[in-house]
Amino acid sequence: MRTRQITAMGQGPLVACALVICALGATTAAKAADYPVLRGSQIEDAPPPPPDFGTGSTNWTGFYFGGLAGYSDTNFDVGRGAANIVANHLRSTTIEAEMQASSLLNMPNFSKRNATFGGFAGYNLQFGDVVLGFEADYTHHDAKGTSADAIARSRTLSDGYSTSVWLTGTTAAELKDVGTLRVRAGYAMGAFMPFITGGLAIGNGTVTSTATVRTNGVDADPSEAPVLQSYSSASGLLVSSRKNSTMLGGTVGAGVEALFGGLLLRAEAQYVRMEAQGNVVVETTTARVGAGIKF
């Protein structure tokens, strides 16, 4: 009997130890479930931030240059292209003074479309979101064409003659190159910037005008003279003028640029209006794209 009690008393501490060990094991397993390294990570990677199109993320200040290519529509207003040479030929005559013969010819306008290319360079200064700067560009055009007209008029003039004048005229015009010097204003939108431009334009080209002038006059009252009085230049007189013309005018435009590091990309539209020698007006509208480097 005593032996059983001793045995039972000896087993009690062992059972208690076993219970404590089991409790500690369960607690450790429960805590281990909260450690990602032990149960596998359930935390997803954070999504990348959205692109920053806000202000201040791109520095637009600095010098830049690049090349451009586009397509141009050039209009030549040559209506009075031959007026100067006709006026010079008929200067100090009753025909010019009273009939304004030099204003009679009116050649139709013509347009040419062609690919263009060139380059640009400029400098920007950024003030917060506003970007101001200046830019010079060059565009090679090589647009040309010809227009012609003919007209005849008769009138009794103050000198007593019934006078007739026949005119034919031709004007050929060519636009070779255009350069501009412009100011720019843009609004920075991160890596993108819409902008407007305006400034001066100078063009290089040629204007060639020719005219044939023929006149004839008959005394309006021949009964007062014993012999019929008349004059004529029946064969006509050809006069011409060819000038290497420097064209001067203005330009406006608008576009958008994108800046990625030092790479500059742009798309823009530009309008140029210039006056050439010989009463010729040249207008060109160009859509173009460009790429360059910004420092």
Q: Could you tell me what each predicted segment is?
A:
Residues R2-I6, G10-F295:
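Gram-negative outer-membrane beta-barrel domains
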